[in-house]
């Protein structure tokens, strides 16, 4: 393991990115394993004890600090008008419609666009204080404007982000900052919170098949899922009620067939996708590349990130498909075709069927939501580049050189 500090007894301070380091140390030590920790420096007294000394066998002081790269930083300068349109639809057609209070955002430009238009577009809809109050989220730099304008009341983080340390320390009202003045992240607790407590998970994907299964594993790029399979599934053990969870559950078309008279909620699981990427790769496909990847790699299971039966909404630049409202697979496939654009899936769209689905609220286009496409411009971004994010933070955010922009 690597950490920031160790004292002479072997107590470990892991820094802002504690994540699941203590859990790994505990699991190893209590299974007759050996725990070795590389630390940046030895000190007389650690800032706080993240791993107790009796779980540690060896400590090595490194001549240079361990390497940590930014993972969650996205440059606002690279957010397109198309992503802003999708963000507007998501906020008005999902966040606002369901009153989403507790949520997790995946990593990417689509969710960064949402974060950056909360203080502008979200404010114009009068939604501050009504949505997006409690977050299970890494400290995304693109969240700074939303935090500074009172949208995000608290963020509980899986880990930290390079350059955000001083800003986090200055906002103990929002982040999990302890008496030592630093944040203690906890991946294990965040995974549990994201699974059971969150009203909604929303994230980007690379492929969605005709049934609604989603994956970021393609023949051109096998990207990791991160926490998406856990965040992006309905927790059947959940019993606490929130407005968004309860409303979504009561909209499930076949709920009476599944639970009879008993009421049940459902987590909103949203995938955001571009119908055809800038490189010409289709987002909607008849069959996921994951099917062939399973065969090629000799896997027991296709690397599906989110399964169709968990997915409640798809947002593309065409519109939103409310999949949980569909009565059967045929209707679900028609809803997907309606927002699939110029792809092999979208080419099978039946305009008459799409019109029916729009009338029933199963498919919503921007005009159905009262959104003027021409207003989806970068002018809505609360920060248009990295310097703007630094300014919003009062100079406390120190972005990695990889992400600096004019």
Stretches with model-predicted labels:
Residues 1-4, 132, 139-207:
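Ligand-binding beta-strand-loop-alpha-helix segment within the catalytic cores
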Residues 37-38, 61, 103-105, 135, ...:
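General beta-strand structural signal in soluble alpha/beta enzymes
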Residues 1-102, 109, 116, 254-260, ...:
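Internal alpha/beta core interface subdomains
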Residues 78-169:
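N-terminal active-site beta-alpha-beta segment that forms phosphate/nucleotide-binding
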Residues 403-406:
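Conserved small/polar residues in nucleotide/adenosyl-binding loops
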Residues 178-256, 260:
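ATP/pyrophosphate-binding catalytic subdomain of soluble kinases
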Residues 16-23, 118-127, 219-226:
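A glycine- and small-aliphatic-rich helix-loop capping segment at beta-alpha/alpha-beta transitions
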Residues 45, 113, 143-144, 209-217, ...:
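Short acidic/glycine-rich loop or secondary-structure boundary segments that cap or lie
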């Amino acid at each position: 393991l690597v950490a920031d500090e160790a004292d002479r007894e072997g107590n470990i301070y892991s820094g802002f990115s504690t994540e699941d380091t203590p859990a790994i140390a505990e699991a190893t030590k209590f299974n007759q394993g050996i725990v070795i920790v590389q630390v940046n420096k030895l000190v007389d007294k650690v800032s706080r004890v993240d791993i107790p000394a009796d779980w540690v066998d060896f400590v090595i002081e490194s001549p240079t600090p361990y390497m940590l790269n930014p993972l969650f930083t996205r440059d606002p300068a690279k957010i397109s008008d198309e992503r802003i349109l999708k963000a507007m639809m998501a906020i008005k057609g999902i966040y606002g419609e369901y009153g989403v209070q507790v949520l997790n955002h995946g990593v990417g430009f689509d969710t960064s666009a949402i974060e950056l238009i909360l203080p502008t577009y979200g404010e114009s809809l009068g939604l501050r204080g009504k949505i997006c109050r409690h977050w299970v989220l890494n400290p995304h730099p693109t969240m700074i404007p939303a935090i500074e304008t009172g949208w995000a009341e608290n963020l509980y983080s899986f880990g930290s982000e390079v350059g955000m340390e001083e800003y986090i320390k200055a906002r103990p009202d929002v982040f999990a900052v302890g008496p030592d003045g630093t944040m203690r992240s906890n991946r294990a607790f965040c995974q549990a919170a994201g699974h059971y407590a969150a009203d909604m998970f929303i994230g980007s994907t690379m492929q969605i098949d005709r049934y609604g299964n989603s994956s970021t594993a393609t023949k051109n790029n096998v990207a990791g899922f991160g926490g998406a399979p856990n965040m992006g599934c309905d927790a059947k053990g959940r019993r606490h009620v929130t407005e968004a969870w309860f409303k979504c559950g009561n909209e499930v078309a076949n709920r009476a067939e599944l639970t009879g008279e008993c009421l049940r909620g459902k987590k909103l699981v949203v995938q955001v996708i571009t119908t055809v990427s800038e490189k010409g790769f289709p987002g909607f496909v008849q069959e996921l590349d994951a099917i062939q990847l399973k065969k090629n790699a000799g896997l027991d299971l296709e690397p599906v990130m989110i399964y169709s039966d968990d997915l409640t909404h798809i947002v593309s630049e065409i519109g939103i498909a409310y999949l949980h409202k569909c009565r059967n697979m045929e209707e679900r496939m028609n809803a997907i075709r309606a927002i699939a654009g110029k792809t092999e899936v979208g080419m099978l769209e039946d305009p008459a069927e799409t019109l029916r689905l729009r009338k029933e609220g199963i498919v919503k286009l921007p005009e159905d939501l009262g959104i003027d496409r021409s207003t989806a411009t970068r002018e809505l971004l609360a920060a248009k580049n990295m310097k703007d994010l630094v300014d919003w933070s009062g100079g406390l955010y120190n972005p990695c050189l990889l992400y600096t922009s004019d």
